[in-house]
From Swiss-Prot:
Annotated organism of origin: Methylobacterium nodulans (strain LMG 21967 / CNCM I-2342 / ORS 2060)
PANTHER family cross-referenced by the UniProt entry: S-ADENOSYL-L-METHIONINE-DEPENDENT METHYLTRANSFERASES SUPERFAMILY PROTEIN
NCBIfam families per UniProt: rsmG_gidB (TIGR00138)
Protein's job: Specifically methylates the N7 position of guanine in position 527 of 16S rRNA.
Primary site of residence: cytoplasm
Positions bound to S-adenosyl-L-methionine: G73, I127, E128, R143
Listed name of the protein: Ribosomal RNA small subunit methyltransferase G
EC number of this enzyme: 2.1.1.170
Length: 212
């Protein structure tokens, strides 16, 4: 990780000094926990500001004004915990629920949320066990968790109620959309990623049901 990567990402995001300090603390926590728990791909850690933080922050622009978020399979808190840290000042009413089934990763999320003051609640549980508990969710997101058809199966109760889905994807975005349309009807667009020209954010809305 270079200082220029950090400075460039923070300048582009136009965050306050306090939010920058909280993101620095997140990065320090990630590096410390990475030595005992493989939270992210080891090769991506030197590029944490561009590969993970900037990649997560761009989701805020994909849902302007949204303050109730749900992040599934949070892992290292990407994107959910990063959004909760950045949203603390940018969107004072921001609340992000993070669902992670792995207890060790859940412990990382809980400790880091506490230290950074992130507007986050951690649920150490399987998605299927808790998805029905969430109401009033404006955006549900998940990164590097599952193919789109499975994501829609998990989040259908929310997406049918007006929640928007934001799912970062790589080159497979279009093929996963095609596969999902074999089962579901929905509206979708792919927002080009600002951090990877071969990737995009699949935005799903108006899910209306499974096809026969």
């Amino acid at each position: 990780m270079s200082a220029s990567d950090r400075d460039r990402v923070l300048a582009a995001a136009a965050v306050s000094r306090e939010t920058a300090a909280a993101l620095d603390l997140y990065v320090a926590q990630l590096a410390r926990w990475q030595t005992v728990k493989n939270l992210v791909g080891p090769s991506t850690l030197p590029e944490v500001w561009t590969r993970h933080i900037a990649d997560s922050l761009q989701l805020l622009d994909a849902a302007p004004g949204a303050t109730r978020w749900l992040d599934l399979g949070s892992g290292a808190g990407i994107p959910g915990l990063i959004l909760a840290i950045a949203g603390r000042e940018a969107r004072p009413q921001m609340q992000v629920d993070l669902v992670e089934s792995n207890a060790r990763k859940g412990a990382f999320l809980q400790e880091t949320a506490r230290l950074t003051g992130a507007s986050a609640r951690i649920h150490v549980s399987r998605i299927e066990s808790v998805i029905g508990r969430f109401t009033g969710v404006e955006v549900v997101c998940a990164r590097a968790l599952a193919p789109l058809p499975q994501l829609l199966a998990w989040t259908a109760p929310l997406l049918k109620s007006g929640t928007i889905g934001l799912f970062p994807k790589g080159r497979e975005a279009q093929s996963e959309l095609t596969a999902a349309r074999e089962t579901w009807t929905f509206e979708a667009d792919v927002i080009p990623s600002r951090t990877d020209s071969s990737a995009g954010i699949v935005r799903i809305s108006s899910l209306s049901g499974q096809l026969p």
